[in-house]
From Swiss-Prot:
Function, in words: Negative regulator of the osmotic stress response. Acts via the transmembrane protein ptr-23.
Loss of function: phenotype: Normal physiological responses to hypertonic stress, such as accumulation of organic osmolytes and activation of osmoresponsive genes, are constitutively activated with mutants exhibiting resistance to normally lethal levels of hypertonic stress.
Subcellular location: Secreted
GO BP, sorted A to Z: regulation of gene expression; response to osmotic stress
Domain of life: Eukaryota
Transmembrane stretches, start-end: none
Protein name: Osmotic avoidance abnormal protein 8
Lineage, broadest ranks: Eukaryota, Metazoa, Ecdysozoa, Nematoda, Chromadorea
Tissues and organs where the protein is expressed, per its UniProt entry: Expressed in the hypodermal syncitium but not in hypodermal seam cells.
Alphabetical keyword list: Secreted, Signal, Stress response
GO cellular component terms given for this protein: extracellular space
Segment forming the signal sequence: 1-21
Amino acid sequence: MPAKMLKWLLIHIFLIHSIFCQDAPAQMPFFANSDPMMSKLSQIQFADAPTLKGDKYPDVDAHRIIAPIISPIMEVFDQMKENQRARDQAEKIRKDREDHPLSTSRSLWEMFQRLQRPTTTTTEAPPLIERLFKPYIEPWQKQLDDFSKDMAGITLIPTTTTTPAPTTTTTPNFLEKSLSMFFPSLRRKPQSIPTLPPTTTPTPRLFDPEMFDRLFFKRDKRQATIAPAPKFDIFTVPPPPPLFQEWEKPILSLSNPFTLNPLMKMFTTPSPPQTLAPLPKIPEPNPYEIKKGLPEPQFKLQDPFYNPLFPSRKSKMFDFLAGGEAGRLLG
């Protein structure tokens, strides 16, 4: 920053000095040298080397010779470059449309073009927000109308024998009222219905089975009916009587591959009877053997009076009954 300020300061001083020196042309500048030797040196002329100016062959027009050859090639390269640029731009637009189908420039452009098309009708055009959301609301509006027609037969009013008075106006439902607040074109005036003569048919019931079948079941299930009984014909075989069915049960069992075939016993031998292994003999008691007290019990009984805090204390009565030391001593 100081260097720039110093530079501009010197330039201003030089300009001011040159302006003031215009009135005195005979005055020499301060950097002029009055040495006579320098004036003689300034009179010396140095020879300049001859330089060729212009083309070496001025009569030959190189541009006219090369241009017809190189210009088609240049045009081809330029066209290829433009084509590549157009393909890149188209690929970019396609990727943007796939990633964000509602935020691309082309979609917005088409949307505004559709909105700016002149209408042939004389009715008032709906608002902009309604025209934008109309493609999304039309399917729901159609389904709502169809459902309203189907639900017209369901009522909470009890059935009576008298014919109710026919209504002359139709009122919009709750959803239509809600949508009409944001979309004025959906507002409709109450339509007059021609008065019908009273009929003798009763009013629909609250739980009409046909209505519920039509709402909650498929068409093929609703239209399914019980198959009629086949009519007797000379070509139809009547079913066999019950007695004959009992007789043919053994014959039919032979054709079942998952049951035993009784005819196979003619080609096989009977299996040997299953016998148990012989039981061991009970040893005969020796009358000359001296018994040594009570026999040893196979299962030790647990002392109910056993105290783990005093393991050495034992009940002599229980020890005797269990065949312990007391029993062996007394035996």
